[in-house]
Design a protein with these regions (language model features):
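Charged, gly/pro-rich active-site loop segments
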Residues: 80-144
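Amphipathic alpha-helical interface surfaces
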Residues: 9, 56-59, 99-103
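Haloarchaeal acidic low-complexity proteome signature biased toward cell-envelope/secretome components but also
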Residues: 1-15, 120, 141-144
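Short acidic (Asp/Glu) patches
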Residues: 51-57, 69-76, 107-118
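A generic structural signal for nonpolar/aromatic side chains embedded in well-ordered alpha-helices
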Residues: 12-13, 62-63, 107
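Active-site-adjacent structural patch at catalytic or cofactor/ligand-binding sites
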Residues: 51-53, 64-75, 84-93
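Short beta-strand segments
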Residues: 16-54, 71
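A short, structured loop/turn motif at beta-sheet edges
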Residues: 43, 63-65, 95-99
């Protein structure tokens, strides 16, 4: 196992579009992790998501309880022999689409599937969020 340098962490975030976002529990119970499409813009150091939720959903309860989150993305760079993973922690804040437009453009080009069947500017069903990064780390694992 080898620690990734910041440049490699940026590469993993820039080159991928699917990760796992873990929201802090409002009751101190286990966090709420879920897969999510994301975009990262290295020029602005912006990590962005657009999330859909309803007022009575578990996701909404967790989002409104504590803004502290963890985010994880991984990739297999060489089949069955090299994997890299990145963990990011910080504060998840509601934002505007114009504030995170470069990161969302990255989301559109990197995601492996359509992240949501509605358009990004349909604010009645989706909300843009930015993860304000406090810390990140990455690891590379090699087999053989």
């Amino acid at each position: 196992m080898q620690e990734l340098r910041d440049e490699a962490v940026v590469d993993v975030l820039t080159d991928n579009g699917i990760g796992v976002l873990a929201l802090s529990s409002p009751t101190g119970a286990a966090p709420y992790p879920f897969p999510v499409a994301f975009g990262y813009d290295p020029a602005t150091d912006s990590l962005a998501f657009h999330l859909s939720e309803s007022d009575d959903s578990q996701k909404h309860r967790y989002l409104t309880a504590d803004a502290t989150v963890g985010f994880m993305v991984y990739e297999e760079t060489e089949p069955k022999s090299v994997w890299r993973s990145v963990v990011v922690t910080g504060e998840l804040v509601e934002t505007t689409y114009s504030d995170v437009e470069p990161a969302l453009a990255s989301l559109a080009s990197n995601t492996q599937f359509a992240p949501n069947p509605v358009s990004w500017d349909d604010t009645s069903t989706t909300t843009p969020y930015e993860l304000r990064i406090d810390d990140w780390c990455g690891r590379e694992f090699r087999v053989g």
